[in-house]
Amino acid sequence: MEEKPNYVIQVEEELPTLLRKATTEEMVGFDNYKENGHPFPHSISRFHPSHASTTTLNGQETSRSIDTMEAHHHNYNETTPWTHQRKPSISMPTSPNVLMISDPTTSLSSENHKNSGSTGKSVKFLSQPMTKVSSLYIESGNGDDDRRQSHDNHHHHLHRQHQSGHHQNQNQAANKLKDNRYNSFKTWSGKLERQFTRKPASVEPEAPNRNNQNLNTNEAMPVDRYYDALEGPELETLRPQEEIVLPNDKKWPFLLRYPISTFGMCLGVSSQAIMWKTLATAEPTKFLHVPLWINQGLWFISVALILTIATIYLLKIILFFEAVRREYYHPIRINFFFAPFISLLFLALGVPPSIITDLPHFLWYLLMFPFICLELKIYGQWMSGGQRRLSRVANPTNHLSVVGNFVGALLGASMGLREGPIFFYAVGMAHYLVLFVTLYQRLPTNETLPKDLHPVFFLFVAAPSVASMAWAKVTGSFDYGSKVCYFIAIFLYFSLAVRINFFRGIKFSLSWWAYTFPMTGAAIATIRYATVVKSTMTQIMCVVLCAIATLVVFALLVTTIIHAFVLRDLFPNDLAIAISNRPRPKQNSQHRWLDQLRNVSSENIENYLKFTDSDSSQSNDVEACNGKTQESDSS
């Protein structure tokens, strides 16, 4: 049999009129390539009518295209010498569906009808990538075909790499948007973020999160959970067996790490403004010649500090309300909600005389309104006998909820008010006495009382020192009532100050700033006492206590700067707000005795069964039965 030359077999549908016209006119550059006046066989347009074969439904095919291809190939072989053997190249369709033969007249009749009525305008068509191959053809190729095919494959490979990289970047962005680990603490859940994506989000079932199952934002966190999950004098350390609902392997958003105890800085700085104002204006300290510009500088710093901290915490309330709510139910943190309002009272007391001398009366009522709201809530819980009764939640930070009454009474009496300051003084003194006795008793239920000394104990000094000055303003003289409160404060102050190893081995936190204003309050009360009792001893006490208070505040300022800018651990993850509502399930201890009963005799097992009805733990029963068995064996 004579060997047939390489040819192209092509199954095509009937072409539209426009393409048929373009190929018959042999437009330059339109699907053809000529060199030395001879068209290459492989580059002859497969859209040419002479090459297109029509397949009928009966499977009959015209041979005009085959004859034409043979003629072109024969002429080209006579004129062009071949220097190498050509390798056949086969292009297969992308799917077997394209091999289905259909009637081209019925499928393209409407298209031909539309094209027949088109105008004669020249239209430039740009080639587009084809997603499917509509025909099966076998064509022969030479070295140019191989190079062209490898070039196309290279571009196709680069295109796929670009698409895969683009899809990978889109997936990373989508995963970042779908990160819902903090949504349980957000005021808005974050599900609306899907509306800002460029492509519509597919409805996918959310994977169950074990942490979210332990987080119920509709219920208040019971106080027992804080005691069970946290430890330490400030209940900020997570117990080893507990888990948190937020990731602990990375830093949380800044607002989640921003505690309410940050307002303690406002208490320390604003109380210093009052102390330096008293040093500059009081009679016993005239010999120091303290200028008033120190008071002015500290007062403006206090205003800027309060505005900054309050603005940041307001953002936390707006964006992460669940975190604020957990701080409010925290048995320690709830007392720091008095700190911003006490700081405002300190600003009113320490305002420089050059700015204003007489404050309006309505300002006092405005500042004391938050105290009424918080005290009705907290004092009611102390008295109700529930899980937040005072004998259960008593800790030294409760002095912050009491000292505000005395500071308010001091400010009101300084402004010329009478009944209001007496009211708050009476309420504060009643609850201070109850709190003082409860803390001194150290009941077994007071789990938050530190075993060793801690800066939190300085809050014992705050209430009596401020109460002595408030009563002196209410009565108009530093009489016996004021002196009793002052002497209590001084005794507590010295009983704590004689401990030289007070701060050794204690981790620094921002709440330490709240423990500095009691020292400042004791120094100011000493100046008031020296005004009545004039002596060299009282003047020395004024200078020493004021110097200690200033040095402590300066030391805390340096420590805060180091932790903020050098160590960068001023705001660690606030584990106190991330505990779960439900305790961690305890490991099943029913199988602890299996290891002890594997290699024992039947007598030991019978002896163990005698103890199964007792109320003691199983491990102790096993040890007891084993011990008795060993004793009987030895005897």
UniProtKB/Swiss-Prot annotation:
Membrane topology recorded in Swiss-Prot or TrEMBL? Multi-pass membrane protein
Molecular function GO labels: voltage-gated monoatomic anion channel activity
Residue ranges of the region described as Disordered: 102-173, 193-217, 611-635
| Keywords from the UniProt entry | Cell membrane, Ion transport, Membrane, Phosphoprotein, Transmembrane, Transmembrane helix, Transport
Q: Where in the cell is it found?
A: Cell membrane
Q: Name one Pfam family in it.
A: SLAC1
Which residues lie in Polar residues bias regions?
A: 102-121, 614-635
Q: Which residues lie on this side of the membrane: Cytoplasmic?
A: 1-253, 321-335, 380-396, 441-455, 499-504, 563-635
- Residues folding into a coiled coil are none
What spans does the record annotate as topological domain Extracellular, numbered to this chain?
A: 277-299, 357-358, 418-419, 477, 526-541
**Induction comment:** By drought stress in guard cells.
Tissue specificity, per the record, is: Expressed in the whole plant, escpecially in vascular systems.
What residues bear Phosphoserine in this entry?
S189
List, alphabetically, the InterPro entries matched.
SLAC/SLAH, SLAC1/Mae1/Ssu1/TehA, Voltage-dep_anion_channel_sf
Q: Where is the composition biased (Basic residues)?
A: 153-165
The principal location of this protein is: membrane
Give the transmembrane ranges.
254-276, 300-320, 336-356, 359-379, 397-417, 420-440, 456-476, 478-498, 505-525, 542-562
Q: Does the keyword Transferase apply?
A: no
A single GO cellular-component term on record: plasma membrane
Gene3D superfamilies reported for this sequence: Voltage-dependent anion channel
Q: How does it assemble?
A: Homotrimer. Interacts with KAT1.
Which purpose does this protein serve, as stated in its record? Slow, weak voltage-dependent S-type anion efflux channel involved in maintenance of anion homeostasis. Binds to the highly selective inward-rectifying potassium channel KAT1 and inhibits its activity. Functions as an essential negative regulator of inward potassium channels in guard cells. Essential for the efficient stomatal closure and opening in guard cells.
What is this protein's record name?
Answer: S-type anion channel SLAH3
